[in-house]
Amino acid sequence: MKRKTLTQYLVEQQRSAQALGPEVRLLIEVVARACKAISHAVSKGALGGVLGSLESENVQGEVQKKLDVLSNEILLEANEWGGHLAAMASEEMETIHLIPNRYPKGEYLLLFDPLDGSSNIDVNVSIGTIFSVLRAPHRVAGADVCEQDFLQPGSQQVAAGYAVYGPQTMLVLTIGNGVVGFTLDREMGSWVLTHESMRIPEDTKEFAINMSNMRHWAPPVKRYIDECLAGKTGPLGKDYNMRWIASMVADVHRILTRGGIFMYPWDAREPGKAGKLRLMYEANPMGLIVEQAGGAAIDGTGRILDIQPDKLHQRVSVILGSKNEVERVGRYHAEAHAS
């Protein structure tokens, strides 16, 4: 039987009772085309002269890789002319990117991490692109937006997704009614539906965390990991395996495929920061995807998608994945705060 393409899937969703709007459909297709271009650049590697770092830093104070900058430019150029967007925001830019006046403006906002896990670029480990779609406030329809218009809780996302550039290139997407996965057919140049309903098991025997930071964690996180390491004879009654790729897209993709819990918690080295990962274009889109796949996503004390952001590049502690494991970590935080 012939498989559906991304375009066919989106058209069917547009026709269905959920009524995906035509602007969102076209926007997702444009983002997907940009991800194909990024995938092509990633796959060329040293042959394309795209490996290595630049002398510049992004707004986060991180040294930019050549592919970081190229991926950011690809997404900006692909999305600014279509008439679907009012503005964009990126990990690589300090301020928002307004749609130029020479192009029509739409009613949506696009946020993205153009190349997540870029520290892995030069060592040929899976990396990816994360994106989130919000609706612009009605008061700004047809006019310029400001940073404040982006500061919406993750529960307001219209769509979210990521592309993972690995042995296969995949696009994982939610428009609020489950999670689907598409694989890039390189011969045909099209995204093909290969995963119709991605679900995360409620329980797991795998955790993903950077164990080298253990001495800096808060007690509830230490407690949970200690119990995982205790194995069958410990309070959780089962042996766990640890997995850590240092690429959020790759780690979350594994969890979507076979279950697990991903943790990038607050640590004591920077006590004034709530966490390391960015809320608006990392935690929120991944949180929506995980929840739509039957999992959970919290910052330790509450649901990530309920957080009201106060700045564009806000950071947050992230604990997401298999529902029962995430809820256990949440209980440990609640017990610690109550004592």
Curated annotation (Swiss-Prot):
GO MF entry, a single one: fructose 1,6-bisphosphate 1-phosphatase activity
Locations listed in the record: Cytoplasm
One of the GO biological process terms: fructose 6-phosphate metabolic process
Binding sites annotated in the UniProt record for Mg(2+) 1: 91, 113, 115
Annotated cofactor note: Binds 2 magnesium ions per subunit.
Catalytic reactions on record: beta-D-fructose 1,6-bisphosphate + H2O = beta-D-fructose 6-phosphate + phosphate
Keyword Metal-binding applies: yes
Keywords on record: Carbohydrate metabolism, Cytoplasm, Hydrolase, Magnesium, Metal-binding
HAMAP family xref list: FBPase_class1
Protein name: Fructose-1,6-bisphosphatase class 1
Encoding gene per record: fbp
